[in-house]
Amino acid sequence: VLSPADKTNVKTTWDKLGGHAGEYGGEALERTFMSFPTTKTYFPHFDLSPGSAQVKAHGKKVADALTTAVAHIDDLPGALSALSDLHAYKLRVDPVNFKLLSHCLLVTLACHHPAEFTPAVHASLDKFFSTVSTVLTSKYR
């Protein structure tokens, strides 16, 4: 459960990303594909080479979904319901992949914002990404 302090840390950090959230989403997705090659199986139609426009575009979609989640941090199930349906029923993404992408998002954010990435912020973002992952996989059951 996200505490009030966690919610503040997440919102403050996300605000500091400014217009870079989409860029970071693409970088994190590319990092996921490079670090965990099995995640590529869901994207056979993509050009997965470094710097791919398709990977960047999908990374922006990920970042946009997270921006929506941050804006609706008190109602994540409601805010992410359609996305949960898509991943559970149509795409059938293995839930472990959300954890892998979450890890790569944390690494990417830490690389770009080392001063702001305090232990408390790291813990709050980790809890937030874990909560988002749980919501996205809730309809798998």
Swiss-Prot record:
This entry carries the following GO cellular component terms, namely: blood microparticle; haptoglobin-hemoglobin complex; hemoglobin complex
Q: What Gene Ontology terms describe what this protein does at the molecular function level?
A: haptoglobin binding; heme binding; iron ion binding; organic acid binding; oxygen binding; oxygen carrier activity; peroxidase activity
Q: Which residues bind O2?
A: 58
Task: Outline the extent of the Globin domain.
Answer: 1-141
Q: What positions are modified (N6-acetyllysine)?
A: 16
Report where it is expressed, by tissue: Red blood cells.
Pfam families to which the protein is assigned, alphabetical? Globin
* Residues found modified as Phosphoserine: 3, 35, 49, 102, 124, 138
Q: Which UniProt keywords apply?
A: Acetylation, Heme, Iron, Metal-binding, Oxygen transport, Phosphoprotein, Transport
The GO annotation for biological process reads: hydrogen peroxide catabolic process
Domain of life per record:
Eukaryota
Q: Which residues carry this modification: Phosphothreonine?
A: 8, 108, 134, 137
Q: Does the keyword Manganese apply?
A: no
Q: Which residues carry this modification: N6-succinyllysine?
A: 7, 11, 16, 40
Q: Which residues carry this modification: Phosphotyrosine?
A: 24
Entries under PANTHER family matching the protein: HEMOGLOBIN FAMILY MEMBER (PTHR11442), HEMOGLOBIN SUBUNIT ALPHA (PTHR11442:SF48)
How does this protein assemble?
Heterotetramer of two alpha chains and two beta chains.
Task performed by this protein: Involved in oxygen transport from the lung to the various peripheral tissues.
The family annotation for this protein states: Belongs to the globin family.
The entry's protein name is Hemoglobin subunit alpha
